[in-house]
């Protein structure tokens, strides 16, 4: 993408996370599929090409989800919506549940893609020589409204809930 991040506002009319236009090696190109699926698919393609040439690789994969506009894949939204119908989430209210089904639907897709990436590394004998690091860039956007591990604050705020992030390393 032609900047340090993929903006929340579409660069092209009609870019809605599905079948969008991205820049690859300086050329605009339309890709088929959901944005996060496309990014992971292209990353795996790059890793396999590098491996087949016996070249070491560094792949920094930064997704644009979960950021607004919150448009998850329908299967992910429906799954989260069903989970949120459980009694233990009744206190959240319907509007928050609707918003969470979008936000957490995007996170579910990232989780699914991380799992596929780990299987890809295993299946292609790349795991033993690859360090996989997963971390996020900031705390939760929703903050303590639904879950923030008991921390005060949320994204853009100075408290722990805004800047403490998960970090997982697999080697």
Language-model regions: role of each:
Residues 1-171:
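Active-site-proximal cap/lid insertion segments
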């Amino acid at each position: 993408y032609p900047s340090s991040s993929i903006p929340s506002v579409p660069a092209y009319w009609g870019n809605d996370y599905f079948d969008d236009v991205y820049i690859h090696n300086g050329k605009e190109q339309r890709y088929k599929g959901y944005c996060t699926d496309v990014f992971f698919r292209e990353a795996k393609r790059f890793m396999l090409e590098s491996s087949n040439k016996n070249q070491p690789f560094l792949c920094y994969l930064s997704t644009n989800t979960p950021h607004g506009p919150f448009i998850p894949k329908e299967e992910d939204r429906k799954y989260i919506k069903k989970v949120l119908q459980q009694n233990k989430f009744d206190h959240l209210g319907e509007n928050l549940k609707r918003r969470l089904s979008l936000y957490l639907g995007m996170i579910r897709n990232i989780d699914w893609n991380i799992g596929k990436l780990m299987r890809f590394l295993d299946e292609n004998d790349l795991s033993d020589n690859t360090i996989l690091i997963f971390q996020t860039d900031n705390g939760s956007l929703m903050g303590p409204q639904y879950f923030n591990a008991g921390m005060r604050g949320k994204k853009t705020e100075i408290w722990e809930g805004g800047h403490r992030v998960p970090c997982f390393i697999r080697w």
